[in-house]
C-alpha cells in the first residue's frame, strides 16, 4: 500500500502542475475540500434468474443462429447485433415450447430501439425505455410450438450497417428455448430456422448464459461527507466489481461477460447529510440511463442528460492512476466528466445496468454539499 501512495503522490504532483483540478460539469462550480476521492466499501450480492446474452458475432456477415439456449422461470434476454452485409436482413427472436403442456411467457419489462447506425443512440434509447419500465407483453405457446416474437413492426428489418439492440425480462412457467437469428429479408423465419446453422462466435466471445442476473451493491456504512470527503464506488472494473462467468450453450465453453452487460444493479446508499451523486465514465464514450428511488418517488435520469454521450473528453488513465484507483484512491481532475444524478439525504437507491455501446468501468461519485 505504501507503494501505491508513492505512485499516487507523483500522480497528484504531475496533475497539479497543470493548474487547478476541476471536473467538466456544473459540479466544477461547487466548493469541496479536496480533489482526492476515496473508494467507499460496499457489500455485493448476486441474485435472480438467468441472463441470455447475445453479442457475438457482433458484426453479422452471414445468415444463421446467433445464440440459443433453454431457460425456465425468471430470465432476461439481451441482444446486440449489427448487419455487416451489403443487403437488408431480418433479425428474429423465436421462442420454442420444449414441454408437453401449454406454456405462458409473461414479459414484465423491456427496451428496444429501432435499428440505427448511431450506436450510442441505439444504446441510450433501449436503456431509457427499459428503465421507464412500462412495457409488458404475453406469449402463449402450445406444446412444442415455435413462435416468432416481434413486438414492433419493422423494428427487426436491418439495412446494411444498422444495429439492433434490445433487452427484456420475462417469466416462463415451463422450459422454453430461445433463438436469436439473422436471416434473409424475404424468408420465412420458422422455415429458415429449421435449416439454419449456429454461427461461430467472434474473437470477443460476448455471448452466453449467466446465472443470477441481478447484483446488489450496498454501502457498508452511511456516507458522511464531513468525514469521508469525496467518495466513489466502482462498477465494471473486474477488480472491485467482478465480471460474471457463464456458459456458451452452443458449445459448452466457459465465457466471461466483459462489462457485465445485461446485469441489473441495485445501488443502495445511505447518507448522513445532503449529498450530490454523479456518474463518471472511466473507459471512454458512454450513453445510458438509470432509475432513482427516493422516499416514495422515482424517475429515470439519462447519463448524460444534456447530450447524447460523454466520456470522450476524459483522457486515458496511465498505469499509475489505474493502479491507484483499483487500490482505493482516485483523482477528480480537470478532465473528469460528471453526469448529475441528484442531491439526496438519507436513503436513496439507483437501478443501473451497463448500457449497450458504452464503455466501462464507471464511478458513482458522492460529493458533500453540507456538513450538518
What are the residue ranges of the model-derived segments?
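Bacterial N-terminal signal peptides that target proteins for export
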Residues: 1-11
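Sec-dependent signal peptide cleavage junction
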Residues: 20-28
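A eukaryote-biased signal for short, well-structured alpha-helical docking elements
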Residues: 29-68, 203-242
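Long compositionally biased, domain-poor regions of proteins
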Residues: 62-108, 113, 134-138, 146-178, ...
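Exposed low-complexity, polar/acidic, P/S/T/G-rich flexible segments that act as propeptides
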Residues: 105, 173-220, 358-372
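Basic, glycine-/proline-tolerant helical and adjacent loop/strand elements
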Residues: 115-117
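Short beta-strand and strand-turn-strand segments in soluble, beta-rich domains
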Residues: 119-136
Amino acid at each position: 500500500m505504501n507503494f501505491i501512495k508513492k505512485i499516487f503522490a507523483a500522480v497528484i504532483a504531475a496533475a497539479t502542475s497543470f493548474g487547478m483540478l476541476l471536473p467538466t460539469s456544473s459540479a466544477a462550480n461547487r466548493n469541496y475540500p479536496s480533489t482526492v476521492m476515496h473508494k467507499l466499501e460496499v457489500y455485493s450480492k448476486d441474485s435472480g434468474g438467468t441472463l441470455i446474452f447475445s453479442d457475438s458475432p457482433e458484426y453479422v456477415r452471414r445468415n444463421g443462429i446467433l445464440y440459443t439456449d433453454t431457460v425456465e422461470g425468471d430470465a432476461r434476454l439481451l441482444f446486440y447485433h449489427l448487419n455487416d452485409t451489403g443487403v437488408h436482413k431480418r433479425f428474429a427472436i423465436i421462442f420454442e415450447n420444449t414441454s408437453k403442456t401449454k406454456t405462458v411467457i409473461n414479459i414484465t419489462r423491456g427496451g428496444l430501439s429501432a435499428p440505427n447506425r448511431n450506436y450510442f443512440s441505439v444504446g441510450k434509447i433501449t436503456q431509457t425505455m427499459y428503465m421507464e419500465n412500462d412495457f409488458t407483453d404475453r406469449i402463449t405457446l402450445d406444446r412444442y410450438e415455435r413462435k416468432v416474437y416481434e413486438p414492433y413492426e419493422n423494428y427487426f428489418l436491418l439495412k446494411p450497417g444498422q444495429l439492433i439492440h434490445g433487452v427484456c425480462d420475462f417469466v416462463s412457467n415451463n422450459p422454453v428455448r430461445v433463438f436469436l437469428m439473422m436471416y434473409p429479408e424475404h424468408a420465412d423465419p420458422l422455415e429458415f430456422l429449421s435449416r439454419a446453422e449456429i454461427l461461430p462466435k467472434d474473437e470477443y466471445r460476448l455471448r452466453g448464459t449467466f446465472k443470477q442476473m441481478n447484483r446488489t451493491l450496498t454501502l457498508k456504512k452511511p456516507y458522511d461527507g464531513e468525514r469521508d470527503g469525496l467518495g466513489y464506488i466502482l462498477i465494471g472494473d473486474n477488480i472491485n466489481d467482478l465480471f460474471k462467468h457463464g456458459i456458451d450453450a452452443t458449445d459448452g465453453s466457459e465465457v466471461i461477460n466483459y462489462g457485465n452487460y445485461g446485469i441489473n444493479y441495485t445501488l443502495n446508499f445511505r447518507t448522513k447529510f445532503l449529498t450530490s451523486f454523479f456518474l463518471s465514465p472511466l473507459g471512454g464514450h458512454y450513453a445510458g440511463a438509470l432509475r432513482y428511488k427516493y422516499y416514495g418517488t422515482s424517475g429515470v435520469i439519462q447519463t448524460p442528460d444534456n447530450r447524447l454521450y460523454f466520456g470522450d473528453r476524459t483522457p486515458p488513465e496511465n498505469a499509475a492512476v489505474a493502479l491507484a484507483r483499483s487500490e482505493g484512491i482516485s483523482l477528480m481532475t480537470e478532465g473528469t466528466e460528471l453526469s448529475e444524478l441528484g442531491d439526496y439525504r438519507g436513503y436513496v437507491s439507483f437501478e443501473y445496468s451497463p448500457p449497450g455501446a458504452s464503455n466501462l468501468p464507471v464511478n458513482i461519485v458522492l460529493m458533500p454539499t453540507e456538513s450538518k
